[in-house]
Design a protein with these regions (language model features):
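Hydrophobic beta-strand core residues of beta-sandwich domains
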Residues: 2-3, 155, 453
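Surface-exposed, short loops/turns at beta-strand junctions within beta-sandwich domains
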Residues: 2-6, 202-205
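Extracellular recognition modules
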Residues: 9-13
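Flexible, low-complexity junctional segments that flank or bridge functional domains
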Residues: 16-293, 297-327, 372, 409, ...
Length: 468
């Protein structure tokens, strides 16, 4: 019975009287899953040694290969492992967790899976003493930066930042793409938008920031110098935000003169509540003789896909389904990390397209909507909202207007959480692959609109089409 980390010294004596000193020592059967105490021991200052950083990268590579259903669907295997070796060789003698993230995150990004990523260690970097750029920015899909807020309102909200310390906005954004997982650049820019402050500090922290900007709808360039501050100093000096009314998951308005209703659809939550909402909305449209319905999905990040099925029953001209196929990989590592002991190791492939289990639409008597339907989508239409947009077009439910959706027709998903053993860096890894109904992995893309316009102009385009 050798205890974990145990070490036992004793003398072995043969029946002839010969003896030998013998040591029995506990060694992990798989050190990448169960490292030794010595490997996990950090320095007093919290730094990782080069050996520990290399170990964390090896553990990351091992776990990715044990969990992900198709690591190399985008990146060539040989090129990826060359990158792994290069990063391990480039590591300095010691690193912080943030520095390890800077080295390792691009390796995960290369896999091209928007759900598989290394997460920035915000709590390790941003402390009460951290000084930071006192400027908050929105990153746009056209590679521009718009001001969300600035200390003392030195740069007004919605002004366009052209450069910071001589680095133009496009250059800043492009340099951060290595840290943004995703299948499309616009999807990755959305990731950068969420993490911009952290990535900027990691890559471009300075003693002062010379910012060149211009006001909205102006070509005149203006300049200001900002100095880094702590969060405690920054917060009371930020412009006060206007109180915003809570946005409902779904709501609708009727324009009786134009005979048009607009459904503002923000989130796929609560199928039961959706059913009550849909009943009420379609009764209203029927009573008022509204023959055109615009469903606005431009700022919908997804949720429960059953919500989509509820709405589809009112608008689909024929039986429908959202999901086509799914591939699931389960390994002992998957089971260990999820804690789902009921899982059985192996591969499972589900082909719903070969089955006849389509969902029937409502009959006219049950409340089916007989008018024209227009769907507005954007690069921000993700997850279940992306699936909704795909099925809407695939089953001919109406006209799609806007930008390619952020959610792809073939994608990896259903993530597990994994922490690198020494640094504690957090990672999400997909263990399933999904195909929307009728999708082909040879042509991976989001839902393509029938009328491609910038998302800001999608509603106006819908009204224009209705007027015709």
């Amino acid at each position: 019975n050798v205890a974990k980390e145990g070490c036992y010294d004793f003398v072995v004596v043969t029946h002839q009287g010969d003896s030998a000193m013998t040591r029995i020592k506990w060694v992990s059967a798989n050190p990448l899953e169960e490292p030794s105490r010595d490997m996990l021991k950090r320095s007093a200052g919290g730094l990782l040694s080069k050996k520990q950083a290399q170990f964390d990268i090896d553990a990351l590579v091992y776990t990715l290969s044990e969990v992900h259903p198709d690591m190399f669907s985008v990146c060539r295997q040989s090129e990826w492992f060359k990158s792994v070796n290069r990063v391990k060789q480039q590591l300095p003698d010691s690193v912080t967790t943030v520095e390890l993230f800077k080295y390792a995150a691009p390796l995960v990004t290369k896999l091209g899976d928007g759900h598989t990523m290394l997460r920035f260690p915000f709590n390790d970097y941003f402390t009460s003493s951290t000084i930071r750029l006192p400027l908050f920015l929105n990153v746009k899909s056209d590679y521009t930066l718009r001001v969300r807020g600035c200390i003392d309102n030195l740069i007004p909200q919605d002004a366009e930042v052209l450069s910071i310390n001589g680095k133009e906005s496009r250059e800043l954004i492009e340099s951060m793409m290595d840290y943004a997982s995703g299948e499309r650049d616009f999807f990755r820019i959305e990731r950068i938008n969420s993490d911009f402050s952290a990535l900027f500090e990691m890559m471009y922290a300075a003693d002062k920031y010379d910012v060149v900007y211009r006001m909205k709808d102006s070509k005149k360039k203006l300049e200001v110098t900002l100095h880094p501050t702590t969060w405690a100093e920054l917060l009371p000096r930020m412009p006060k935000k206007k109180e915003q009314a809570r946005v409902l998951d779904y709501s609708f308005k009727v324009d009786e003169k134009k005979k048009v209703a607009v459904m503002d659809f923000r989130s796929f939550n609560n199928p039961q509540r959706t059913k009550m909402f849909a009943d009420s909305m379609f009764v209203t449209l029927r009573e008022k003789g509204i023959k055109n319905l615009i469903i606005d999905l431009r700022n919908n990040g997804g949720g429960n896909s059953m919500v989509g099925d509820v709405l589809f029953r009112y608008i689909s001209p024929k039986p429908f389904k959202q999901m086509g196929k799914a591939l699931v990989r389960v390994t002992p590592t998957t089971i260990r990390l999820t804690g789902r002991t009921q899982m059985v190791p192996g591969w499972s492939f589900y082909n719903d397209e070969s089955k006849g289990n389509f969902i029937p639409p409502l009959t006219k008597e049950e409340g089916h909507y007989e008018g024209s339907v227009y769907l507005l989508i954007s690069h921000h239409t993700f997850s279940s909202a992306g699936s909704f947009a795909w099925a809407f077009k695939e089953f001919g439910m109406g006209t799609v207007i806007g930008e390619e959706s952020g959610g792809m027709n073939v994608s990896f998903g259903d993530i597990i959480y994994y922490k690198l053993p020494v640094s504690g860096l957090s990672c999400t890894i997909s263990f399933k692959r999904f195909w929307q109904y009728g999708a082909d992995e040879k042509e991976i893309h989001g839902t393509l609109p029938d009328y491609a316009v910038p998302q800001e102009g999608a509603l106006a385009k819908a009204f224009q089409l209705i007027k015709k």
